[in-house]
Amino acid sequence: MFQRLSSLFFSTPSPPEDPDCPRAFVSEEDEVDGWLIIDLPDSYAAPPSPGAAPAPAGRPPPAPSLMDESWFVTPPACFTAEGPGLGPARLQSSPLEDLLIEHPSMSVYVTGSTIVLEPGSPSPLPDAALPDGDLSEGELTPARREPRAARHAAPLPARAALLEKAGQVRRLQRARQRAERHALSAKAVQRQNRARESRPRRSKNQSSFIYQPCQRQFNY
């Protein structure tokens, strides 16, 4: 830019162009509010990449591809500033984020009924018990499913006891509800009211007063 101004004022001849030096393809530069805007001419073609393979002889040479984007935008200083309070806030990972990954015992996929083998106990499937011949996958499948069946067969008695207790509680609740409905029925209430209103009958033997006839007076 300063060379252009100096050439306009002092009329200094421009330096000779070197054929080996690439041409400048920028025709106009402008800086507005920290954004550098560069305009490229329409006739600019992208230089061929050095690693590109040469085109075969049977194909025509490809047409020069013009650059689709003629504007290059650089971010303003507020995005590239460094220091406290100048740049964007950087999020730091918390050490508690990988808690479940670092501690598999807290995973929700761990089942409670796991089989723990004692250090002195023999393995459930020793190598000596296996035959020397090759076995197919169908013959090995039952042997692999035996530990799983034993694992699920252990809590069956406890589950049966819980179901029996739940059945007893349900029967007691039904009997209690039936008694309450019977006590609150209309006929039962009517019988209770009639029993309260009715007076007990007195027997003749209980009366101690004896009625005697009075003396009659005849007027002749």
From Swiss-Prot:
Q: Which GO terms describe its cellular component?
A: autophagosome; cytoplasmic vesicle; cytosol; nucleus; PML body
Motif LIR positions after renumbering to this chain = 26-41
For this protein, the record's InterPro entries field holds: TP53INP
Q: Which residue intervals make up region (Disordered)? A: 1-24, 41-69, 119-220
Disulfide bridge map: none
Carrying Phosphoserine, the residues are S14, S136
The primary location reported for this protein is: cytoplasm
One Pfam family of this protein, by short name?
A: DOR
Q: Which GO terms describe its biological process?
A: autophagosome assembly; negative regulation of protein localization; osteoblast differentiation; positive regulation of DNA-templated transcription; protein localization; tissue homeostasis; ubiquitin-dependent protein catabolic process
Q: Name one GO molecular function term.
A: ubiquitin binding
Where in the cell? Cytoplasm, Cytosol; Nucleus; Nucleus, PML body; Cytoplasmic vesicle, Autophagosome
What PANTHER family does the record tag this protein with? DIABETES AND OBESITY REGULATED, ISOFORM G, TUMOR PROTEIN P53-INDUCIBLE NUCLEAR PROTEIN 2
* Domain text: The LC3 interacting region (LIR) motif mediates interaction with GABARAP, GABARAPL1, GABARAPL2, MAP1LC3A, MAP1LC3B and MAP1LC3C.
Q: How does it assemble?
A: Interacts with VMP1, GABARAP, GABARAPL1, GABARAPL2, MAP1LC3A, MAP1LC3B, MAP1LC3C and THRA.
Name the UniProt record assigns to this protein: Tumor protein p53-inducible nuclear protein 2
Species for this entry = Homo sapiens (Human)
